[in-house]
Amino acid sequence: MIEIGDIVAWDCPYEETTIHGIVTDIIHIGGRIIAVNFGNYQDLIFDEVKLRKIA
């Protein structure tokens, strides 16, 4: 299960590469919605199934 502070991977369909980021928030709205920061100033929002836990 993904938790705040975990390092996750996302397979970016636009750049055809894998991007790694840190989970900054988890929201429960009919499922788990996860905010991830990839090193820039804003977080991106994902459904849990689109992310893989690395560490």
Predicted features and spans:
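Basic/aromatic-rich interaction segments and small domains that mediate binding to polyanionic partners
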Residues: I4-R52
